[in-house]
């Protein structure tokens, strides 16, 4: 956001949730993606068969700094030992792989790439509803940020986004996952 506000970049496409706090600083496109919350653990973990957030009770957990996964989701785990937030997704995954934590909560694309890099991890998807983490639409709607008042850029981006289908977005996400460093 600071790079957008200073004019160093025109826009940022980086999995940013469109929150009221962020929208006070920058403008956003319409949402282009809705994040899915998942949990990663090791296949031999006591939590590997968890079917709900309640099943994660007592876990040592972490996630990435500045994310809803850390700020909103982890506190919902009863009696969790919440470690400090990790600076990056790779650091979060190293914490899990090294045994520093039992679980990490993240988004599906990060988790899917991690499964390629760490075959001893397993992905837990609680499928929404009562078994899942409780988040608002604001927490999971992802948009493109741009400098406040740049209505021409906002309109142009929204016009392009309006031509795309959910299948288009999912195909692009799959392509991005396949080429990111975690999946190599």
Locate each region found by the language model.
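Proline/Glycine/Serine-rich low-complexity intrinsically disordered segments
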Residues: 1-184
């Amino acid at each position: 956001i600071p790079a957008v506000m200073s004019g160093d970049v025109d826009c940022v496409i980086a999995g940013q949730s469109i929150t009221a706090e962020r929208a006070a600083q920058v403008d956003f496109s319409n949402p282009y993606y809705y994040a899915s919350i998942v949990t990663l653990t090791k296949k031999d973990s006591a939590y590997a068969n968890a079917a709900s957030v309640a099943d994660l009770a007592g876990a040592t957990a972490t996630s990435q700094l500045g994310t809803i996964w850390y700020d909103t989701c982890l506190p919902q785990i009863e009696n969790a030992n919440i470690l400090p937030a990790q600076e990056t997704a790779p650091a979060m995954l190293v914490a899990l792989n090294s045994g520093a934590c039992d679980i990490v909560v993240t988004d599906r694309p990060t988790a899917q790439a991690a499964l390629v890099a760490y075959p001893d991890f397993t992905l837990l998807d609680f499928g929404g509803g009562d078994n899942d983490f409780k988040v608002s639409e604001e927490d999971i709607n992802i948009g493109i940020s741009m400098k406040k008042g740049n209505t021409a850029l906002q309109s142009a981006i929204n016009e392009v986004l309006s031509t795309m289908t959910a299948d288009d977005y999912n195909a692009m996400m799959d392509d991005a996952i396949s080429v990111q460093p975690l999946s190599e």
